[in-house]
Amino acid sequence: MKVILAEKPSVAREIAAIVGASEKQDGYLLGNDYAVTWALGHLVQLALPEAYGCVGFHREHLPILPRPFILVPKQIPEDKKGYRSDPMALKQLKIIDSLFKKCSSIIVATDAGREGELIFRYIYEYLQCQKPFQRLWISSLTEKGIKTGLANLQEGSAFDLLYASAQKRSEADWLVGINATQALSIAVGEGIYSLGRVQTPTLAMVCKRFLEHTHFQKKPFYQLRLKHQKSYTDFFSISAKIEDKKEAEALQKQLEKSPMAEVISTEKEVVKEQPPLLYDLTGLQKEANKKWNFSADETLQIAQSLYEQKYITYPRTGSKYISEDVWEEIPQLIRLLQESEAYANEAKLVKIGALNKKMVNDLKVTDHHGLLITERFPTNLTAKENTIYKMIATRLLEAVSEPCVKEVQKTLLEALHTDFLVKGVQVLQAGWRAIGGFYSDETAKDSEKDNEGDSNQVLPELVQGESIKIKAVEILSKTTQPPALYTESGLLGAMETAGKTLEDKAQRELLQGAGIGTPATRAAIIETLLKRNYIERKQKSLIPTDKGMQVYQWVKSLTIADVALTGEWESQLQKIEQGELSPDSFSSDMEAYTRSLTDTFLAMDIPQKEKLKITCPKCRNASLLLFEKVAKCPDEDCGYVLFRNVCGKPLTDELLKTLFEKGKTPLIKGMKSKSGSTFDAYICLKENGETAFEFPEKTSKKRKY
């Protein structure tokens, strides 16, 4: 008997149907000499410090450097007792262990990527299994995709380096996260301040951008915009920046008296704008956030659902390209869209006999190719699923279309010894832009940044030496703009291209192709920062909370917050996967770094905050214990608890102090109701310690929460 281990029950069922394992058992499917079971994600993890005898946060325990690391079943929090093994994980591990002992060999069908490999290998090692295994490596869960994969199983040993990379990533996260968190928390003296190899530099980027935005001093500047007409066509020219308003006004008056300009030079260039490549996961997340305000995690979950329904290929991809063999399937996918009512109009603009092969590059395909639809056309999608599917389908149509051909004209005018620029664009062949898809117009964005304006206007024929009449002169009042706050789209882009933001050229070259995190993990990093109350969403922007900013102030000068160092680690993990770096060498470097980082934190002199003392409003005896998420009475007979997150807003120490001293907080704006609507209210304390809302316009209206 062969055992097939999938990552999720839904995937196991698809594979079981194809291999003929139709008999349902507890935790697996049986039949045709196959047992198909599943892992429920990470069933096995690295043990917590308690497994190494390090209970609690104590200076003398640090740094904790396990040799070797211990594997344990998935751990879940247990009230007042730390952590315990997840009963569901224990049950499924027992089932897998039983099947492994009975089988002759194993087929690994966890997700084809670094984390999927780690899920299987940790289970395999924890159960001390010695059975031979092969790898099912597929990008599509369609019947064709699974059958092709099963017919072309690869030897498990071919993925040993992928596992080594995944293992060292997991261990590095443990070393840095556990030790840095404990060391900083000890240095602060109270509370837990979580740090991480990837989350901390990401937090640093958000905080740094927020400070740059907040402290930016806007400066006014002015530009003169001239209106012209020739051959019944109106067009505009614009000056360079003028810092002095009086100078701009004086020039305006002079031009109104002498309303003529001369063409100094003019040039035309035919530009071919190549179509965009396919989406990788980060590209999809960025565009979905920009266009539809989907969070990165939401987009990933929707894409994963579409994948499991067999409508798209594997979503956690870092490539925008496809291989030559996959290219053979593209015409069939185009015809599928041409025959569908929803996509027929756009798809019929694509010429099957002249498809653009720019996205074909075997060398740039990583674990998986760029995102594609499958030959299975979707039915009964939710609105959000349909949005993501349409993005992927439309991008495919764009990617195989002809270039957009434009004639770009730049003309320089001179009036009263002042230069004025005229820019115009005429589309000669719409090409991929006729698809009308989701790709943002970077050209338009760039022209806005350059303050050149009107760059897409259609121009008449302009000849050097020609005199052009000025019909109107307008002063444009503008201000320099601060760096924009990060949206999720912007932060994903910054994480993806972390090296490109560095000023040092050598560092940029070193980190080319490396970023912070991976396409599969970036959404989770952002969600972790939100969950830990380090950042928050404000409209479409991500901004640091007071807690997040405090952590940043402590760590901003340290290497743990350094984008370059984190990017370099990602680069080293890639080298391990490619066989260019020894895993042991990476481990030694990480241990040395952990020692240094821990020593730095423990030597920090952080001023201790005066502890807030609040008498329990219920029993009136004990002082409340203040935790990040709750304030509670230590007297178990009293049992008073106040949750510190109310309708999406945290009750800070300052708000708690005001609430218990004055019986009422200041007005808190932007709280969210269960229906998702926002409201403003005061939080009031009643005599029995319970709280209620008081609304500013109807002070008599209170409701318990």
PLM region spans:
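C-terminal or mid-to-C-terminal helical accessory/interaction module adjacent to the motor/catalytic core
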Residues: 88, 143-228, 268-269
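Short strand-coil-strand connectors
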Residues: 30-32, 227-231, 414-418, 675
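Conserved short loop/turn motifs at secondary-structure junctions
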Residues: 1-3, 111-112, 189-194, 268-277, ...
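Basic, low-complexity terminal or inter-domain segments flanking catalytic cores
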Residues: 2, 25, 82, 89, ...
